[in-house]
Amino acid sequence: MKRLKNLFIIFIFLFLLSQVSAYITFKNIDYNAQYLEPSKTYDLYITIESDKEINNTVVYIEPTNQISKENIEIIRGKQWIGHLFPYEYGVAHLIIKINPNAPNYDYKITGYCNYTKGNQQYSENRIFTLPVRGKANLVIETTNNILKVGNNQILLLLTNKGTGTAENIKIEFQNSNNLMVLGDNTFTISALGSKTSTYIPLTIFAKKEGVYSINYKISYKNPYNLLELTQKSETIEGDSKTETLTYQNKNIVEETGILTFNVFPNELISINIKNPTITVGKIENLTISIKNNYKDSLFVVQISKYFIGNNQKSIFIKKGETKNLTFQIKVDKEGVTSIPIVIYFDNNQIEKNLTINVVGKADLVLSGIDIESSFNEIKITGDIDNIGTGKAKSVLISIEKTKNIIPKKPYENYFVGTLNPDDYGSFELHCQINGNVNEIPLKISYRDEDNNLITIYKTVKISKEVVSLKTNNNGGINYLVVGIAILFCVGVVYLIYRGFVKKK
């Protein structure tokens, strides 16, 4: 009894299986390439085979999962085939497009086949794999398209902006009339992956100013076959039609390009300081002179040390023009000093150190003045003090000759020498005075630390009554004779007195 029950179950299972067994078979899917590339459109050919006579046959496709749905666009996703005899093939011609940014991945699509047999409707399906391996897209960019006349060492940026790997890369640069590639002009790179970059060092000799270009040729290999349809033909014999497709393997890619450069003089700008020497500890104007050898541009100049107030200024300078910018600075230490500046213009940045000489400034004053008079001659003695911050070299003090003041040798001038800050030197001057004089003009000359000749003028007042001397004796009083006579009289009186005392 139990055995009969088992046989009955097997019979029912086989009957049901016969009712749902497939009458078609998915034979293959063809897209005429080893791999699919992003951004390309492909013809898909899905072939089915019927085991029985079927009708109303329709084949369609849908992305199987979410990632496939995001990266595969169905352009034509359904094909009517209709009636098929037993063991007859049916081909569905469908069209898809791969997303331009599709990453390397084995995407999935599901092929469906709906048909009728008798009065029954059936549906079969199969999952197909679409391998997308990406397409390399090599781009060469200049990191700086500005060259100077003469030799230029530059870096070119080679980037694979595509989604596939490029292998056996070869780049060849070609000289032009005014731009020459020095050294080896051919570069090879084994491989460059997607979204990666590498630098190409290049030495270019530019002959003269202007805008010039060099051409380049780049070739590389895709690591898979890229079949490209080159010919399509149809042959019709009776009721049958044969379609012949011819493909060419395009896995070797060759491209050309142009790199354009602006060539300028060796120095885009010339920078000078109008006043390279300033005084220590004093707020001074620093005037920077800029000559534009480049092109009409707005210049922004920035200094980073010693500035007082604004440290950044801008000015528009035409090509060939020279203009000045003035900053206020203060430096509290003597010596040669560097002032770092940065100049921005037209996406250029130039950094320089401007050199200035910071010097002290001598300040000479007179002290300890003493005036002695003897007849018609004046003797002036005193000190010259340097109360400044700079050195005074070759200090010379002299009496200015006037109508009534005649300097007398060997003391008409006095050489003091070098006076350092907080140093002093003594001097002695002689002159002859005629007429009424109440002050004596003095001239002090010296050389500063930049060897510039400095002259200052001072006057010394005679602290007594105004000296009145005459060189002409006619009608005048001879004070020397009067003095001798007085002394003689005093002597005579003294001798008489001594004689009188002895007698007594």
UniProtKB/Swiss-Prot annotation:
Membrane topology of the entry: Single-pass membrane protein
Record keywords: Membrane, Transmembrane, Transmembrane helix
Database matches in InterPro entries: CARDB (IPR011635)
One GO location term (cellular component): membrane
TM annotation in the entry: 6-26
One Pfam assignment: CARDB
Compartment(s): Membrane
Iron in keyword set: no
Entry-linked PANTHER family: NPCBM-ASSOCIATED, NEW3 DOMAIN OF ALPHA-GALACTOSIDASE (PTHR35902:SF3), S-LAYER DOMAIN-LIKE PROTEIN-RELATED (PTHR35902)
Family: To M.jannaschii MJ1506 and MJ1561.
UniProt name for this protein: Uncharacterized protein MJ0795
